[in-house]
Regions:
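N-terminal helix-loop segment corresponding to the beta1-alpha1 unit
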Residues: 1-149
Length: 149
């Protein structure tokens, strides 16, 4: 059976919930999603219980149907590996704090736009990139506290 996104390659630099859930849906629809984890692994692996084979079921669920690779994006070699992965990618999805990609020398305007003009760069954030809360972390507990839930 053909899937709607089977010819799309997505590089997934996301963590926690919003980003991994978004890329999980893309993978479920056939996209080739490559999850790039920190060189020490994804901290969400240990968020449980329940656990299965030493991994949190939460982590297993939001990362199903994905391939993964661990890369140290702070190192020159790690940046080279990411650039290589992006050469034939359609989409890059990340949910780092505002300015992180730029600090690493991987910003869209500074590097990615020119090097990969067809690449779609999706930046997920809780409060957007600008405005009074722009760039602030947007975890569920924070949103609940702010809204009085």
């Amino acid at each position: 059976m053909k899937h709607a996104l089977e010819n799309f390659k997505i590089i997934d630099l996301t963590r926690v919930l919003g980003g991994p859930y978004a890329t999980q849906i893309l993978a479920d629809h056939g996209a080739d999603v490559i999850k790039v984890e920190a060189h020490i692994g994804d901290e969400v692996r240990g968020w449980g219980p329940p656990f299965s084979n030493g991994m949190a079921s939460y982590f297993i669920n939001v990362n199903r149907n994905k391939r993964s690779i661990a890369i140290d994006l702070l190192s020159d070699k790690g940046k080279e590996i990411l650039i290589k992965l992006l050469e034939d990618a359609d989409v890059l999805i990340e949910n780092f704090k505002t300015g992180t990609m730029e600090k690493w020398g991987l910003g869209y305007e500074e590097v990615l736009k020119e090097k990969f003009p067809k690449l779609i760069h999706c930046r997920i954030s809780g409060f957007g990139q600008e405005g009074p809360l722009g760039g602030a972390p947007g975890y569920d507990a924070i949103v609940q506290a702010m809204t009085g839930m």
